[in-house]
Amino acid sequence: MTSFSEIPKSISEVSKQSIDIPKFAKYVNPNDIKDFNEADKKLNVEKIKCINEELEGKKHPITGVKYKRCIVEDGDGNLKEGVFPQFKSEFDAKLPPDEYKSTDSVQFNRANKQLKEAIAENSNLASKFTPQQLEMIESGRTPRGYTWHHSEKLGILQLVDTKIHDQTRHTGGKKFWGGGTENR
């Protein structure tokens, strides 16, 4: 339970604690915005059609994965608004910008390398995997039972449960920042 002493005393304290503020937020003046549609116009946000967007704010009926509306940046600095699944990730890998539009193979190799390095430094992370999975990670492979998901967040690959990923139809980050299907 949170005590009152743990609650920030002012908005400025909250903003100091928040580290997940999107780049586009600097273009928004709250005094100029009266509703979300007006904000979208000022930001030049393109609304895009997403698979299962009708599940916004709901959970997938089979997997229980929640869908959330987000504004994301593509690899070219454009803003897109869509509805995306919020998978439980065991590990997030961050690609360098020059690999955003690389093939899946290049991206997954980079992610596997980051996972291997993170496990070497963090025994709590290692404890999430079986000995066989750790062996696969050590040899540079994606651990059995997991898939690298292209998050809607620019350059982020999430290590998620393969079965849940495969059963949760969605539009992923590969479409926006990863070069689309031609870069598979």
PLM segments and residue spans:
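Nuclease and nuclease-like effector domains acting on nucleic acids or nucleotide cofactors
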Residues: T2-T147, E152-R184
